[in-house]
């Protein structure tokens, strides 16, 4: 077993994906699983079959808060956070992260892999010809950290519930050490598949949650890092476009589209008013 790296997995209704992943690396690395969906079946299976895995329940206060909580149980020099819907993270690729960390003499803030199934518009990546390439941002789906440096930076900002927490971390981290994409670590990210959705109602509620938090977090990120005045000027056209779409879909009777933009309006307006990211799945 490697005693330099701990693998951190955040599970939210992701039992099968989590089990499939840990079966590939169970006896190779220390593993911490943080579950914020109160998955008792996953807990029972871990306790029965994987005695050396640390399993913890946590109140669902968001992705960043869960990772910060997990980091308090990390007692290795490095740790890797990995979404259950990532394919390609195995012993070989984890050791590549470790090799790069040592090659850089630990002078990095975070390391990330190359995503093979994403387009350049939605996910900016580095020149694949450069193996260790500086990046402004690393995707939160898979990030490799030096534990001490992560702690010194204060971890993730827990004001973010969903989206932009890794962007905020990388922006802060970049002022101290660089973030790097490791292009010979190639993975696939099946975005949105980590949560097992039981029915259409759950699917719709999850989509509402994502719409609300994306716009809330985007405004909060800009306000925090670039100031209130800049953020207001930047987002006022966005707000007006949302209002116009709400008006248009009200007149045309498109209830589904109207609801979508009402959710975006509420998320952005709440963030502009300085309200917390308190949107949750309806019971």
Question: Which residues make up each language-model segment?
Answer:
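Non-catalytic, C-terminal membrane-associated alpha-helical segments of glycosyltransferases
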Residues: 209, 213-216, 228-283
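Conserved donor NDP-sugar-binding/catalytic core segment of glycosyltransferases
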Residues: 86-123
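A short, conserved alpha-helix in the catalytic core of glycosyltransferases
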Residues: 142-145, 149-154, 159-186, 191
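A recurrent flexible, glycine/aromatic-enriched loop bordering the glycosyltransferase active site
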Residues: 128-148, 161, 167, 203-206
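A conserved acidic beta->alpha catalytic loop
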Residues: 35-43
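Glycine-rich, basic loop-to-helix element that forms the pyrophosphate-binding segment
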Residues: 58-74
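Short aromatic/hydrophobic "clamp" motif used to bind/position activated sugar donors
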Residues: 79
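Short, well-formed alpha-helical segments that are part of the catalytic scaffolds
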Residues: 9-27
